[in-house]
């Protein structure tokens, strides 16, 4: 089991940490996780930031790896101004979190070993 905490750094003219802004504007953001070809279960951490609608933002999570031979990918998206969110949405691809509407601010895929 691994505990993950996301930190959003923006680099352009100056280095800028946007994590605080995301926390302050928690109701305007939501994070989804989608493992691919990896036997991983992602849970939103008990100490994660909670939006006013009762949904956890996703900045803090717990990753349970079910196989020692797990090699795959994890896709993480930060959605800005979604019209609705569901933190408990599981799908056939083991995605955690679902949104309707909004814009994708961040869309990254990382290797999982």
Where are these regions (language model features)?
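First exposed extracellular module after export/assembly in secreted or surface-exposed proteins
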Residues: 1-113
